């Protein structure tokens, strides 16, 4: 692929902008060019419910994780050590202060250090989103891939509002509900099943699964498992 990209550069082609917008990742018709369809074509949006972190009426982000189509994980050490970074917070703040400020609200670390958290998410997961490889851009600017990755995760969190999915079905913080009720609320609101995880019977995470149409259009699909929640689940207030 890199040889093709090099040739495209020499002849002035705009390869990234010419990608097909119809092929769905993990399908037989998926584009073999990893700039046009992600190499790891099943992507997980994981959101947290952590009392004391983020707005009282919002799930916060844990990460956007590209996986193999089978559900197997991408490499645990990330996919491109040359693009790993330990200073993601400063990169985002300098490139897009609005995104940075939104991440402070909706992507806080529950361990107290946002930069360490974000740098981990980028280095382990962001570098595995092949469509954000610098070679895939027509006129790449340093840090553009980083901003695009985090902006996409933030956009998906906003578009797939789990708090609203629950509240629209009568599930609100401070109550106890069955795991089945929570699953049904997500499925009726988004049209797909979620992975819902608990810690000692208390809601902790909700994960939504996506395929990718073309380079950057995310299409929700059923999660590969229902998660660890079972029976009665506490949904605490923040």
Swiss-Prot record:
SUPFAM superfamilies per record: Ribonuclease Rh-like
In the Enzyme Commission scheme, what number(s) does this protein have? 4.6.1.19
Q: Which CDD domains match?
A: RNase_T2_euk
Catalytic machinery residues: 62, 121, 125
- EC main class here is lyase
What InterPro entries does the database record attribute to this sequence? Ribonuclease_T2_eukaryotic, RNase_T2-like, RNase_T2-like_sf, RNase_T2_His_AS_1, RNase_T2_His_AS_2
Gene Ontology CC? extracellular region
Keywords, in A-Z order:
Disulfide bond, Endonuclease, Hydrolase, Lyase, Nuclease, Signal
Signal peptide residues are 1-16
Q: Could you tell me one molecular function GO term of this UniProt entry? A: RNA binding
What are the cysteine partners in each disulfide bond?
19-36, 26-69, 35-136, 79-128, 198-229
Biological-process GO terms, alphabetical = RNA catabolic process
Catalysis performed (reactions): a ribonucleotidyl-ribonucleotide-RNA + H2O = a 3'-end 3'-phospho-ribonucleotide-RNA + a 5'-end dephospho-ribonucleoside-RNA + H(+)
Its transmembrane ranges are none
Which superkingdom is the protein from? Eukaryota
What the protein does?
This is a base non-specific ribonuclease.
Family designation: Belongs to the RNase T2 family.
What's the name of the protein?
Answer: Ribonuclease Rh
Organism of origin: Rhizopus niveus
Native organism taxonomy: Eukaryota, Fungi, Fungi incertae sedis, Mucoromycota, Mucoromycotina
